[in-house]
A protein has these predicted regions:
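Glycoside hydrolase catalytic-domain groove-lining segments
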Residues: 463, 469-477, 541-618
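Glycan-recognition and catalytic regions of carbohydrate-active enzymes
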Residues: 624, 635-705, 740
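Beta-strand-rich modules
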Residues: 92-111, 182-201
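N-terminal catalytic cores of secreted or lumenal carbohydrate-active enzymes
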Residues: 218-550
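Pro/Thr/Ser/Gly-rich low-complexity, intrinsically disordered linker/stalk tracts
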Residues: 32-63, 97, 110-153, 187, ...
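C-terminal motif of bacterial Sec signal peptides marking the signal peptidase cleavage site
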Residues: 21-24
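Carbohydrate-binding surface patches
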Residues: 687-727, 764-769
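The feature marks long extracellular or luminal low-complexity segments
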Residues: 838-840, 846-984
Length: 984
């Protein structure tokens, strides 16, 4: 502390003196005062929001002299100081109602400020509004109009309704305006209304009560929707088609199935990608069209077709060739020359002397099956066939006699690989990986469409045996195959086949029932199933329209699909409207096509669903708007009537209005939202020629879709909806109308209105948002809902659960009055009314004594929700009689053949059948039966001209009683005869 000269520095001396003074005053050691610290952060901060204010309070911090209140409008800050308090509370009045604020508080003293307290948020709200005043109600026809005086500060109102004076009330709407029209009322019922005002602060008390009774006679169409009636899943596979333009069209239109089919597919060569057009076009070989139509073909490779269709979000339906020939090279790629191998058409003018005046205008050497005189039929020779076709064999165990052969087994293996793995949901209620196969195409008319390779009409036996053989083999080549058959052509051939008197040679049984019966029994004998879906083509038969005006054709196009379902429609077709078309079916001149065919399938081969793999009715042209309305009607019918699969011939083209009609069901909003999946009842009192309605709900019960078709070209349709079991809130409409035929127009969302008006010539989907009034714990079905039974016959229904686990108790089953239903006179008995997850119920049906269509309704409850299901009993002619006429009550040594054949006699009676050629199925409990050709525990024997069918029985190797049962055809009433034999 000295400088270099030895003197003490003045500054250092001063510091020393100050330090000594501080030491004496307690600057160190244990005596005297302390150095201060800021207080701890407050704790326990709470906030209470009020109207225009937020009240804060917290726990005091030790040593704090005041508190700073900080506020922000975002969680976690930043914060701005809004006030100071010396107390442990603060009232923030500088706030806006409805805004959320975030607060923290800090403690302060002379030594500084603490950190933040815990954060708390609060949202100041206004006080609830006052109750509305001056509520008035004006009753109208099917509606009640309400109005009231506004409540200050209200953001919306609750309209509440009851049917008793003083309540209770249920909220039916939440409008923001001071008026509301209630269109969900029933004329003649008195309703009581109150209104409350609502804001963020809460709900007011009730307004004054008013009452109103709507009256009047509604002159429009009444549509009654019941979401707890006739509930069933709509198969997604009903929205199919053949030959869409391309994969973009598949995806955009929402096609769920794309069919590879048609006459040409019956001769498809899977290696060369070719087909023969046969009688459709001069018997020439061409490149096959998988997608698109001539001349813009693509995907002629069948395996690539499958891959492309699946990539587009759809499911392929292939056609498995059952004819014995497939095409060679396409004719357009071959130069005409003198060598016969250069001619890829069957009937050549130059080579065969075919008629020269009936030739392909683009290839004048290709003719038809007429000799040079243009009158005599030319039958194709083996040389003609061999230059145009290759033989098609089942597999390589069969010998190719000469040249090139193709093999079904190889093709099926390639198709199976293209289909890929995955499960197939049966009964086809969801889109999965199904390997769908049509077993050829319209096999009943091969003798016409493919007369070159099949010169004779197809017979009953050929059609059954060929199908059963090839369908059974296909399952070994592709174990996931779903086989559709017989892919029958049309109404006349359903019942008569194509082979002259072949029907009378088979017991007089109509072709399709005979074929189905034969396949079922063959499957029973082989312990297999060869038929997965019963498939027919279903062009609604109409009259000769050659003299019709365009307006008449349009009227027919929008009404013709009544053919599918209407029990009252006497067909305008000269084919259907004939008593001689079928001798066995009831109501012969009424098509009733879907219920009738489903009833036949359920009677003969239980569990077999129905498909239409060709349908359309474009009487006024594919591009006409009437075709779009007809198609929209058809899609609704196919879903309501429980079809399993359908493919339109051909798929709608994007340039035509019916393309948009399909999208109303599959992609109405461009985002692939479509018609809901659970069909429900939607009856109406309109003229079915001019109006149709269909309904379905979503699986969660929050969406109801309604399809409304106004098929009247001149007049709007005013419609009053009654929704049972569903509480509607709002809806959006999607409309296709003749004035904008290629555009689906969407409305804005709006409150539900029970009365709406639909433009002339329009198709509209209403997508209604709401909720089920009650959600079923279990859904159930009649199993089956349609079946055929002979006059005075008996059949059993076995209702079962389709979803849920709650037991269902059936309370009633009655034949009822239904438009078009016959006066049945039969009975329905609830033999076992309880349905459980593990056990079906039982309803015994005793048919009446009059053939016809009998409608019935069954009611059941799961303990909370009551549902109804309706169905049809198709009552046929009286059954034929089947009686034992020999070989009963015999005894013989074990292992020996009884000396007398077991014989039965079929007496047709009033059944409509004949005695000759009927199939009788014999089944033995032990031993072996033989019909002289085949043997086993089950064999089929045919009746002779006297109606007698017989088999021999070889007794089993051990002593016992042997029971043998004989069954007559189902179409003749399925009479039973029994034998009792003894092995000793």
């Amino acid at each position: 502390m000295t400088d270099r000269n030895g003197f003490v520095e003045l500054g250092s001396l001063l510091i020393l003196v100050i330090a000594l003074l501080l030491q004496g005053c307690g600057g160190s050691g244990s005596g005297g005062g302390t150095t201060g610290n800021p207080p701890a952060a407050p704790t326990g901060l709470t906030a209470t929001a009020g109207a225009g204010q937020v009240s804060l309070s917290w726990t005091a911090s030790s040593g704090a002299t005041s508190y700073n209140v900080l506020r922000g409008t975002a969680d976690g800050g930043p914060y701005t100081q809004v006030g100071t308090s010396t107390a442990t509370s603060y009232m923030d009045t500088n706030v806006t109602n409805g805004t959320t604020y975030y607060y923290v508080v800090t403690a302060v003293n002379s030594w500084g400020q603490s950190g933040n307290s815990n954060q708390i948020s609060a949202t100041p709200v206004p006080p609830p509004p006052a109750a509305p005043t001056n509520l008035t109600a004006t009753a109208g026809n099917g509606q009640v109009s309400l109005s009231w005086t506004a409540s200050k500060g209200a953001s919306s109102y609750h309209v509440k309704r009851g049917t008793a004076n003083g309540g209770p009330y249920s909220t039916i709407a939440s409008p923001t305006a001071t008026n509301y029209t209630d269109s969900t009322v029933t004329n003649g019922t008195t309703y009581y209304y109150v209104v409350t005002a609502v804001n963020a602060g809460g709900e007011s008390g009730n307004s004054n009560q008013v009452s109103a009774t709507p009256t009047g006679s509604f002159s429009g169409v009444a549509v009654d929707v019941n979401v707890l009636a006739n509930r069933h899943t709509i198969s997604p596979y009903i929205y199919g088609g053949a030959f869409p333009n391309d994969t973009t069209a598949i995806s955009d239109s929402g096609l769920t199935v794309v069919r590879w089919g048609g006459n040409a597919s019956s001769t498809y060569n899977w290696k060369l990608f070719t087909d023969n057009a046969d009688n459709d076009y001069y018997f020439e070989d061409f490149t096959f069209c998988g997608l698109g139509v001539y001349p813009t073909c693509s995907d002629s490779d069948s395996a690539q077709f499958i891959k492309d269709v699946k990539a587009a979000g759809s499911q392929p339906l292939m056609t498995m060739v059952m004819l014995p020939w497939v095409a060679q090279s396409p004719e357009q790629s071959i130069q005409q020359g003198s060598g016969s191998n250069n001619y890829h058409w069957v009937f050549s003018v130059s080579q065969d002397g075919a008629c020269s005046s009936k030739v392909d205008p683009y290839n004048t050497d290709a003719g038809i099956n007429l000799e040079s005189d243009c009158a005599t039929t030319m039958v194709a020779s083996s040389a003609q066939l061999n230059r145009t076709y290759y033989p098609l064999l089942d597999d390589h165990t069969q010998t190719c006699q000469a040249g090139t052969c193709e093999y079904r087994s190889d093709w099926a293996a390639a198709l199976s690989t293209a289909f890929g793995s995955g499960t197939c949901s049966i009964p086809y209620s969801s889109i999965t990986s199904c390997h769908f196969y049509d077993m050829d195409n319209e096999i009943d008319i091969w003798g016409g469409t493919h007369v070159d390779v099949h010169p004779n009409p197809s017979g009953y036996d050929e059609l059954a045996n060929t199908y059963w053989t090839e369908a059974t083999k296909l399952k070994t080549w592709d174990t996931q195959a779903v086989r559709l058959g017989p892919v029958s052509c049309c109404w006349w051939f359903y019942w008569n086949g194509a082979n002259g008197n072949d029907k009378n040679a088979h017991g007089g049984v109509d072709f399709l029932p005979w074929w189905l019966n034969e396949i079922y029994w063959q499957d029973q004998i082989a312990s297999t199933r060869s038929l997965d879906i019963f498939d027919i083509h279903a062009y609604p038969d109409g009259p000769d329209t050659s003299g019709y005006s365009q307006a008449q054709k349009q009227a027919l196009a929008v009404s013709i699909y009544r053919d599918y379902w209407d029990p009252t429609l006497v067909s305008p077709s000269g084919t259907i409207n004939q008593q001689y078309t079928t001798y066995i079916q009831p109501n012969k001149t009424i098509a009733f096509r879907i219920p009738r065919m489903r009833a036949i399938a359920n009677m003969i081969y239980p569990g077999t669903p129905l498909a239409f793999t060709e349908w359309s009715a474009a009487f006024a042209g594919e591009s006409d708007f009437s075709t779009a309305l007809g198609d929209a009607d058809a899609y609704g019918i196919l879903g309501r009537e429980r079809m399993s699969l359908s493919t339109r011939w051909t798929a709608p083209q994007a340039a035509n209005p019916n393309y948009q009609a399909l999208k109303l069901y599959t992609n109405y909003d461009g985002s692939h939202h479509g018609f809901a999946p659970i069909s429900v009842s939607a009856t109406n009192n309109g003229d079915p020629n001019l109006f149709s309605s269909y309904a379905a709900v979503s699986a969660d019960g929050k969406t109801l879709t309604l399809m409304v078709l106004n098929k009247d070209p001149q007049n709007s349709a005013q419609v009053q909806f009654a929704l049972s079991g569903f509480n509607p809130a709002s809806f959006v409409s999607y409309t296709l109308v003749v004035s904008a035929p290629n555009t689906i127009t969407a409305s804005s969302s709006q409150p539900w209105s029970a009365i709406q008006t639909f433009a002339p010539y329009s198709a509209t989907v209403l997508v209604v948002t709401g909720s089920l009034a009650n959600t079923p714990s279990s859904d159930w079905d009649l199993n089956p809902d349609v079946i055929m039974v002979p006059e005075s016959g008996t059949v059993t229904l076995q209702p079962k659960l389709t979803s849920g686990t709650a037991n269902v108790t059936l309370s009633s089953a009655v034949f009822d009055s239904f438009e078009g239903a016959s006066a049945c006179g039969g009975t329905l008995t609830l033999t076992d009314p309880v349905i459980t997850p593990s056990q079906s119920g039982t309803i015994t049906v005793n048919a009446g004594g009059v053939p016809g269509f009998c409608h019935f309704t069954v009611t059941g409850s799961d303990g909370t929700v009551t549902q109804t299901e309706g169905g049809w009993i198709v009552v046929g002619n009286p059954p034929a009689d089947l009686a034992v006429s020999g070989g009963n009550n015999q005894s013989g040594n074990v292992g020996t053949t009884l000396p007398e054949p077991l014989a039965v006699t079929l007496t047709p009676g009033q059944s409509g059948g004949t005695a000759t050629g009927a199939s009788i199925l014999f089944t033995t409990s032990a031993g072996t039966l033989s019909n002289g050709t085949t043997s086993g525990p089950k064999v089929i024997a045919l009746t002779n001209s006297s109606g007698v069918a017989s088999v021999t029985l070889t007794l089993p190797g051990t002593p016992q009683t042997v029971n043998v049962q004989a069954e007559a055809p189902y179409a003749l009433g399925h009479a039973i005869a029994n034998f009792t034999e003894t092995a000793q």
